[in-house]
């Protein structure tokens, strides 16, 4: 008899415990069909999956630099953006759209900065390729038409990187039917100025300081001569 009463007591505790957990989940918006939150928009920006190993860019970018750059700085921007997106209708949008929709909102400056920095970094990872590549076909024709030669374009990329005061980015962009080299400060991006980015070089100090200290020019030249992914740049040209 006592065993039966004990079992009834345990069942009763389990029932009330389950009921209490369910009430708390509903109250906090963490309970819903298929595990989905009913408390508002919910999404998580995921890190870009690199197509190469983090040591594959050595000796021009060390594994240690890349691990800090990708795992700390870039991941930090994503984490902060996800934190700021919590409960926002913007959380369901892709990263690029979040960046565009917050670019001119004074009350969303922090979200823009982190989303744009995450987007810029992902574009930078794609702009790099172990061993680099060579521009061909339509891209090479546009380079020659816009700059005269590939060497002239490379010099302009280096000049723009060195001319950027403080943190920022150097870009190869398409504006209308012409290629241009531009620079942007902090989290700014050519997409916000009606231009089509083709590739970029990160000139924030965290991108190179462990390897090159204050020698930004050496870092940029190493990328231009050995790591630029011209295939990626060509793929970003609008299809005619």
What are these regions (language model features)?
Residues 1-12:
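N-terminal secretory signal peptides that target proteins for export/translocation
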Residues 6, 32-33:
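Mature extracytoplasmic/luminal segments of secretory-pathway proteins
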Residues 12-14, 123:
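Hydrophobic alpha-helical segments, especially transmembrane helices
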Residues 17-32:
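Bacterial N-terminal signal peptides
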Residues 36-240:
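Feature for soluble, non-membrane regions of globular proteins
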């Amino acid at each position: 008899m006592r065993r039966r009463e004990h079992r009834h007591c345990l069942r009763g505790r389990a029932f009330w415990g389950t009921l209490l957990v369910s009430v708390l989940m509903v109250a906090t918006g963490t309970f819903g069909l298929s595990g989905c939150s009913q408390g508002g928009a919910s999404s998580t920006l995921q890190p870009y999956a690199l197509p190469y190993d983090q040591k594959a860019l050595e000796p021009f970018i060390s594994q240690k630099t890349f691990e800090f750059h990708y795992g700390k700085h870039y991941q930090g921007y994503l984490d902060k953006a996800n934190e700021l997106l919590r409960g926002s209708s913007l959380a369901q949008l892709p990263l690029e759209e979040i960046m565009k929709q917050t670019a001119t909102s004074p009350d969303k400056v922090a979200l823009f900065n982190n989303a744009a920095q995450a987007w810029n970094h992902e574009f930078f990872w794609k702009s790099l390729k172990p061993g680099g590549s060579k521009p061909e076909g339509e891209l090479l024709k546009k380079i020659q038409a816009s700059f005269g030669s590939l060497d002239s374009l490379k010099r302009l990329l280096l000049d723009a990187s060195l001319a950027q005061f403080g943190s920022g980015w150097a870009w190869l962009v398409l504006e209308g039917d012409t290629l241009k080299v531009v620079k942007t400060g902090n989290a700014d991006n050519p997409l916000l100025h009606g231009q089509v980015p083709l590739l970029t070089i990160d000139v924030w100090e965290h991108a190179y300081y462990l390897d090159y200290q204050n020698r930004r020019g050496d870092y940029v030249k190493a990328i231009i001569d050995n790591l630029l992914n011209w295939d990626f740049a060509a793929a970003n040209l609008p299809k005619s």
